[in-house]
């Protein structure tokens, strides 16, 4: 009995030593795949990695050089079976640009990245998570102004509208919780050889 227990403990100990090594090996392979991809696609002038769905595989978020008055578009890639796979994209309208920096906003609780869109009569914020190999909307907010203003927050394709003054206060708190305080800003890096070596680890 003692011998079996000793063998079991030894096996668990060896496994615990092997696991970090296998994770490091996977991360190294991941960094090589992303580095090669960025070198082959120089039009992606900005990049960073972020484990959006917290599955141990970092996603690659890239962006191109945009015109000053156009939206920033962020393209998301991941790795499936040692192949790079396009997941989707999110946009930040000009009003939501962070100066000349390229930034992405991430809600770690919902495992989702933020999109910000504007129109002549209002704006909308969306949170997208990874489902399979695509980006899927998880929470959305719409605020349109004008003669008949609309305040709504949607989950699972169902929108809730806020009409009274007290309702709108609740709306503002939810927007803050989901899209502002609930999100952390991550800065993208210029796609240079030194930055690839530094940040793709």
Model-found features: residue ranges?
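Bacterial N-terminal signal peptides
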Residues: 9-18
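Acidic, small-residue rich beta-repeat scaffolds with periodic aromatic anchors
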Residues: 11, 107-201
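Sec-dependent signal peptide cleavage junction
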Residues: 17-29
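Blade-edge motifs of beta-propeller repeat domains
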Residues: 26-43, 83-99, 192, 198-201
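Beta-propeller blade termini
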Residues: 43-52, 97-112
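Acidic/hydrophobic-patterned starts of short beta strands in beta-sheet-rich repeat architectures
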Residues: 54-64, 107-115
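Beta-propeller blade repeat segments, especially FG-GAP/WD-type strand-to-loop junctions
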Residues: 71-88, 125-133
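Repeated scaffold domains used in trafficking and secretory/extracellular systems
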Residues: 94-104, 146-151
């Amino acid at each position: 009995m003692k011998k079996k227990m000793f063998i079991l403990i030894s096996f668990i100990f060896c496994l615990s030593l092997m696991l970090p090594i296998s994770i490091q090996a996977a991360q190294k392979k991941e960094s090589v795949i992303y580095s090669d991809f960025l070198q082959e696609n120089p039009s992606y002038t900005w990049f960073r990695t972020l484990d959006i769905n917290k599955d141990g595989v970092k996603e690659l978020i890239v962006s191109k050089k945009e015109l000053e008055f156009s939206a920033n578009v962020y393209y998301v890639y991941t790795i499936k079976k040692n192949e790079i796979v396009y997941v989707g994209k999110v946009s930040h309208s000009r009003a939501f640009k962070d100066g000349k920096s390229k930034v992405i906003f991430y809600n770690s609780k919902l495992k989702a990245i933020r999109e910000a869109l504007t129109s002549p009569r209002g704006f909308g914020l969306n949170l997208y998570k990874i489902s399979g190999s695509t980006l899927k909307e998880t929470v959305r907010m719409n605020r349109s102004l004008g003669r008949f203003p609309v305040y709504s927050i949607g989950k699972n394709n169902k929108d809730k509208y806020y009409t009274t003054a007290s309702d709108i206060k609740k709306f503002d708190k939810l927007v803050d919780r989901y899209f502002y305080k609930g999100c952390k800003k991550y800065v993208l890096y210029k796609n240079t050889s030194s930055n690839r070596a530094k940040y793709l680890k």
